[in-house]
């Protein structure tokens, strides 16, 4: 009934109450505090958000809606009306519950985020404030005695008023424990899920002069639940005073912005990192054979200046680009606390030729390698010619062998023997040493008429050093003065005991000229090879040694190779010393081309990129890249060794050379036909010098004389020596134009004699003193315009005008000079002999007395010789 009356109430235009405009915002004044005690009153206002109250949670409204629906919908039965009413009520309740649940979840999420941010900011602000307060307290403690009382007094009311500040609004997390917790009205109990949310009052910062009834009026019978507010400390609450700093009141501290806190935190972190030593990282530093200081510093991640300081402490004065050895670098790395690992550039040679030992099942017999050694002109090459039925000795310049040759001979029984012929001249010691190193048996050729000679003894030493057996061939048995017994007896002095004297050394009396007992020599060699049981594996990569190397026009660099293991084929890639190449052709000792070379077979190999050195190892590798790496490493190693040899000496040595005078040098450019001759020439010429003059080899190589050789000789004013080679037309024309001397030779001792004569001509001549006579002073005369003249008697020898004289007084030399005048009876004479009187005067000297003795002598110039 009540609802019906409300709907039927008469309408009226008169308002029920007085119209008024409510305030949309609350205003107030706050005082802002700044640094240095400044403050300012500002006007602020807080606007309240307008929210429309939800009707979903009001039970009365729901009932009215249901009744209204029942009034207008008269076509439904009471049961249907009750069911619809229940459905509407349930839907409204579910919607309210869902909305409330979402709202609570959103509020809880925001509360957690705000709480976390607030706690973080408060913690940072508290820590920074404590640090600032402590610093300020320490600073203020020293000035407290000087601070006027009136400056400290105003701070007391401010500190005292701090506890009267209004308490902060409660957070969404619930009531905070405090003195006003019990005074909260009971209306703040949790609302039911169906209750509509009420807008909470906004927190308003009011002036201290505002009246308290204003706050009370805002509270109603049912005070609304306060809206959650972000609890953040105000950025500026007041300036820091001495009293507040000493009491440690946190409320008097002035807050800082988040950005300022972040910057301060980063600054403190950087300061702590600078003050605390950083944790050192231990690195593994790879150290090669040589390394410069900058590279070492980079690998350790250290400054180059620190590395140089460490080197200076170790006594090594080095620059940033100077190279140091591996041992010094390892000490530096250990000084910095890092770990070092030594590596070497020679690692590229690892595994080169170091194959596994060949099994006995793959080994086959091979011919013996025999080296013929002995003194010069004892018939080594003639003996080989007789066995090969050739005439090599007839083509040798000067009748001596100056090359090392390798040949293979087939005996009557069909067996093969490889012979290596070595020079016997003293200059070819290196060749003989190479021959003994690669050989299996040494045939020592001794002339029956000469016996044991110096190079024979040297050959015996090479054979003993190589630990190879010796077969003695006593040659020239066709001569009438041959004495083989003397040879056998002389061999005993060098620990070679032949079979005739109870030893185990085989010896054969032969004659190369008449081909006497050559078959017995072959039998002795084969017997010795059977005892040695020489075998090799032919089915593997080839290994050998360079016997000789040369440069031929149209063929390039050619080397004679003695194969020791494996089989060498055309197309193989190889490394020989510092050079590499690919086999283009193989030529045997008869000049025939072959496709393969088996063990103990000497062949000429074409295809070198450069000329190798005699005695270098010859090894076949798997590919071209490996060959290039090994070749580049060995060339770099040779260059470094050359730089070490030509490096400047110490400062003391330089001063010694300046004081003693630099030794005169004869620059020489040597070009020869084969590498062995180059070595022999260099060794022979370098032995010719002495302390006054010496040979300086500018360049020594294999091949013809070209323009670059002439240019090099011109730059040093040197001499060019061509041994069995000639200069090309362009080089000859350039040498003629520039005045460069080119000497051609084919015999090595002729080169030595000529160079020795040149060095002798560079020596300073020596002077020899020759005594010629004595004269005694009998009287002294004073002659006007002449001075004092001595009247003398020649007591011994003769006296010559212009000769050197010494004036002796009491057997002490008081003057040394020369005669200016020599007269006899007023006539100038050239000489006065013993027993005659004469008059003499000295050049620029007049202190002569009666009784003095004049010694007369001459200086003879003597040419110096080496």
UniProtKB/Swiss-Prot annotation:
NCBIfam families: IF-2 (TIGR00487), small_GTP (TIGR00231). Its main location: cytoplasm. GTP binds at residues 374-381, 421-425, 475-478. Residues 152-164, 179-197 have a biased composition (Low complexity). Residues 421-424 are annotated as: G3. Residues 26-36 have a biased composition (Polar residues). Residues 92-135 have a biased composition (Basic and acidic residues). This is Translation initiation factor IF-2. It comes from the Bacteria. Residues 374-381 are annotated as: G1. It holds the Pfam family GTP_EFTU_D2. Keywords: Cytoplasm, GTP-binding, Initiation factor, Nucleotide-binding, Protein biosynthesis. Belongs to the TRAFAC class translation factor GTPase superfamily. Classic translation factor GTPase family. IF-2 subfamily. Residues 365-533 form the tr-type G domain. Residues 475-478 are annotated as: G4. Residues 1-63, 92-257 are annotated as: Disordered. One of the essential components for the initiation of protein synthesis. Protects formylmethionyl-tRNA from spontaneous hydrolysis and promotes its binding to the 30S ribosomal subunits. Also involved in the hydrolysis of GTP during the formation of the 70S ribosomal complex.
């Amino acid at each position: 009934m009540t609802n019906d009356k409300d709907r039927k109430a008469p309408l009226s235009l008169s308002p029920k109450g007085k119209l008024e405009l409510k305030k949309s915002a609350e205003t107030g004044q706050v005082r802002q505090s700044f640094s240095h005690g400044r403050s300012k009153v500002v006007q602020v206002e807080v606007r309240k958000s307008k929210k429309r109250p939800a009707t979903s949670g009001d039970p009365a409204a729901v009932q009215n809606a249901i009744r209204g629906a029942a009034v207008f919908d008269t076509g439904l039965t009471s049961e249907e009306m009750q069911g619809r009413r229940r459905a509407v009520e349930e839907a409204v309740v579910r919607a309210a519950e869902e909305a409330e649940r979402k709202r609570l979840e959103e509020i809880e999420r925001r509360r957690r985020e705000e709480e976390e941010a607030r706690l973080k900011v408060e913690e940072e602000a508290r820590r920074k404030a404590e640090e600032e307060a402590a610093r300020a307290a320490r600073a203020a403690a020293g000035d407290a005695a000087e601070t006027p009382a009136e400056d400290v007094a105003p701070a007391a009311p401010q500190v005292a008023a701090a506890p009267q500040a209004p308490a902060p609004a409660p957070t969404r997390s619930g009531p905070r424990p405090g003195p006003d917790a019990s005074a909260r009205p009971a209306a703040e109990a949790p609302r039911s899920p169906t209750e509509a949310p009420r807008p909470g009052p906004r927190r308003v910062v009011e002036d201290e002069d505002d009246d308290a009834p204003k706050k009370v009026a805002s509270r109603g019978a049912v005070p609304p639940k306060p809206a959650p507010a972000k609890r953040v400390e105000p950025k500026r609450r007041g300036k820091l005073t001495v009293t507040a700093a000493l009491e440690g009141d946190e409320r008097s501290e002035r807050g800082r912005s988040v950005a300022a806190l972040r910057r301060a935190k980063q600054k403190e972190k950087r300061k702590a990192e600078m003050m605390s030593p950083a944790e050192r990282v231990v690195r593994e530093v790879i150290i090669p054979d040589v390394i410069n200081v900058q590279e070492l510093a980079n690998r350790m991640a250290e400054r180059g200046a620190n590395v140089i300081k460490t080197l200076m402490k170790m006594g090594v004065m080095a620059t940033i680009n100077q190279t140091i050895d591996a041992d010094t670098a390892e000490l530096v790395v250990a000084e910095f606390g890092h770990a070092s690992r030594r590596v070497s550039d020679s690692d590229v040679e690892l595994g080169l030729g170091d194959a596994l030992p060949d099994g006995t099942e793959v080994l086959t017999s091979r011919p013996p390698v025999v080296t013929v050694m002995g003194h010069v002109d004892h018939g080594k090459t003639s003996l080989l010619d007789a066995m090969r039925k050739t005439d090599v000795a007839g083509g040798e310049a000067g009748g001596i062998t100056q090359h090392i040759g390798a040949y293979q001979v087939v005996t009557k029984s069909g067996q093969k023997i490889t012979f290596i012929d070595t020079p016997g001249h003293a200059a070819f010691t290196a060749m003989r040493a190479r021959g003994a190193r690669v050989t299996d048996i040494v045939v020592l050729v001794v002339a029956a008429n000469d016996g044991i000679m110096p190079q024979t003894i040297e050959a015996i030493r090479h054979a003993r050093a190589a630990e190879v057996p010796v077969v003695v061939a006593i040659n020239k048995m066709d001569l009438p003065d041959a004495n083989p017994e003397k040879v056998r007896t002389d061999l005993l002095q060098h620990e070679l005991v032949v079979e005739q004297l109870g030893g185990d050394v085989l010896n054969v009396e032969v004659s190369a000229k008449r081909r006497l007992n050559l078959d017995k020599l072959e039998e002795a060699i084969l017997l010795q090879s059977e005892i040695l049981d020489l075998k090799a594996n032919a089915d593997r990569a080839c290994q050998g040694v360079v016997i000789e190397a040369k440069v031929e026009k149209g063929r390039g660099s050619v080397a004679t190779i003695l194969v020791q293991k494996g089989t060498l084929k055309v197309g193989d890639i190889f490394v020989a010393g510092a050079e590499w190449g690919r086999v283009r052709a193989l030529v045997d000792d008869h000049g025939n081309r072959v496709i393969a070379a088996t063990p103990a077979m000497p062949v000429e190999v074409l295809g070198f990129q450069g000329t190798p050195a005699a005695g270098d190892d010859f090894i076949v590798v798997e590919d071209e890249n490996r060959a290039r790496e090994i070749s580049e490493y060995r060339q770099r190693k040779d260059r470094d060794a050359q730089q070490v040899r030509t490096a400047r000496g110490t400062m003391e040595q330089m001063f010694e050379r300046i004081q003693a005078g630099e030794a005169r040098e004869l620059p020489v450019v040597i070009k020869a036909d084969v590498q062995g001759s180059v070595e022999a020439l260099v060794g022979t010429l370098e032995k010719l010098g002495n302390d006054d003059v010496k040979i300086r080899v500018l360049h020594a190589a294999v091949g013809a004389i070209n323009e670059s050789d002439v240019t090099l000789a011109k730059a040093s004013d040197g001499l060019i020596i061509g041994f069995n080679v000639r200069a090309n037309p362009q080089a000859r024309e350039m040498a003629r134009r520039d005045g460069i001397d080119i000497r051609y030779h084919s015999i090595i001792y002729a080169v030595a004699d000529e160079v020795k004569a040149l060095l002798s001509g560079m020596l300073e001549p020596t002077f020899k003193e020759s005594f010629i006579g004595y004269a005694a002073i009998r009287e002294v005369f004073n002659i006007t315009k002449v001075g004092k003249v001595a009247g003398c008697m020649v007591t011994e020898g003769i006296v010559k005008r212009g000769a050197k004289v010494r004036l002796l007084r009491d057997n002490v030399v008081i003057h040394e000079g020369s005669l200016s005048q020599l007269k006899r009876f007023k006539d100038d004479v050239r000489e006065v002999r013993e027993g005659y009187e004469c008059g003499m005067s000295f050049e620029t000297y007049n202190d002569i007395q009666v009784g003095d003795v004049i010694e007369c002598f001459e200086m003879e110039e003597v040419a110096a010789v080496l």
